[in-house]
Amino acid sequence: MSLSTVSNHIINPLGNVVYGNPSSPTSTSSSSSLTPTSTNEEMIKKEDSGTSEPSSPSTGECNGKKAGRRKIKIEFIDDKSRRHITFSKRKAGIMKKAYELSTLTGTQVLLLVASETGHVYTFATAKLQPLITRPEGKNLIQSCLNTPDNPNSPSMANQNSNNNSNLLQQQQQQQLQQQQQLQQQQQQQQQQQQQQQQQQQQQQAAQQAVQQQQQQQAAQQQAAQQQQLQLQQQQQQQQQQQQQQQQQQQQQQLQQLQQQQLLQQQQHQQIQQHQQQQQYINSNGYPETIYDIQDKDIERRLGKDNNNNNNNNNNNINNNNNNNNSNNNSGNNNSNNNNNNNNKNNSNNNSQYIQQQNLNIDLNYSNPNVYPIGNYFQQTVQSRYIQSSSSASSSPASPNQFNYSNHSMPLNNQFPPC
């Protein structure tokens, strides 16, 4: 089996096999082929010389060469760089030894070297090579490499110490981190508490503001309600006053209507009575000539002229008209009195009493100075014949000379017979 056919298979810790370049053993390049015996002897000599104890240096040698190789103490190398150099040298040597062994003896050899970096170096003959190339062999190698190391081994002790130191550092770092986290949490809690307090204060301030606004609104609403109630009460009072005024006005109107109705009834009754009296007078009246004869007789007895009597009568009539105008309040009475006065100016009128056509005439005639007789207003006896009261005692009595003391008309405007 030639050296060129041998290949190194590298398996990383993840289970992937890395195929590296074959290791090239440092063999002597000579044209003559070495026999297995010669090569074996030479290798044995080299091993003996490499593993043997170093001989004491001879003082007689003057060439300055070393007497032998320095013996290396077989123990774990702490220096990582030295350990890497030693691994590379020893790995090459052992690979060469495995090749020589398989070649010289014809035995099946399987060599596997795993570095601390996770690389795996293998040497296998043809029959044992499937253990490395097949997935089953790869998985087996990977499972073996994944098993924990022996704690009694020096490398494991150093690794444990390193791991312990690392663990301590990690624990310290974790503690620091935890302390920092606690401090951060405390700060966050304090900030949260401060924020909560601020929020509570803000909420309280907002609630107080809202309560104040609500109180102000309630006060405003109460004031508005009171104003509305006052306005409503005022309106109700005004309405009640208006209703009372309307009721009073209605009552007054009713009273006025009732009074008017009563007045109308009284006037109607008085008119009916007056009409009845006029009818009775017309039926039982005296001729006008009687009154003319009586007046002329009285004037003759008094010794006055007719002209003077007429003037006096006219003056008395005018005075009576003025008195009637002052006593009467309605225009209808004035018009009727004027009509009566105009009728009196006609001395030759022989008609009877003029019937009143206006129903609104004041029938309660209260002037005691004048009263109707015939077709004109005659003055009272006392005012008309006051000068002849003493001289006419021996004259015969006339129809106009009765009841001088009362100065009023007889009942039903009736005169005693002449």
Curated annotation (Swiss-Prot):
InterPro entries: MADS-box/MEF2_TF, SRF-like_MADS-box, TF_MADSbox, TF_MADSbox_sf. SMART domains: MADS. Disruption phenotype: Cells have an abnormal spore morphology and show a greatly reduced spore viability. No defects in the overall morphology of the structures were observed during development, except for a delay of 3-4 hours in culmination. Prestalk gene expression is normal. Expression of the prespore marker cotB is unaffected whereas expression of the spore gene spiA is greatly reduced. Mutant spore show no formation of mature actin rods. The spore outer layer gets wavier as the spore ages and suffers a progressive degradation. Gene3D superfamilies: Transcription factor, MADS-box (3.40.1810.10). It is found in: Nucleus. Residues 400-418 have a biased composition (Polar residues). Induction: Induced by the protein kinase A (PKA) which is activated during culmination. This leads to the expression of srfA in prespore cells. Residues 14-67, 144-170, 301-351, 388-418 are annotated as: Disordered. Keywords: DNA-binding, Nucleus, Transcription, Transcription regulation. Its main location: nucleus. One of its GO terms (biological process) is regulation of transcription by RNA polymerase II. Residues 67-127 form the MADS-box domain. Residues 22-39, 51-61, 150-170, 306-351, 388-399 have a biased composition (Low complexity). GO terms for cellular component: nucleus. One of its GO terms (molecular function) is protein dimerization activity. Required for proper slug migration, spore differentiation and stalk differentiation (under nonbuffered conditions). Could be involved in late events of spore maturation necessary for spore stability. PANTHER family: SERUM RESPONSE FACTOR HOMOLOG. This is Serum response factor homolog A. It comes from Dictyostelium discoideum (Social amoeba). The gene is srfA.
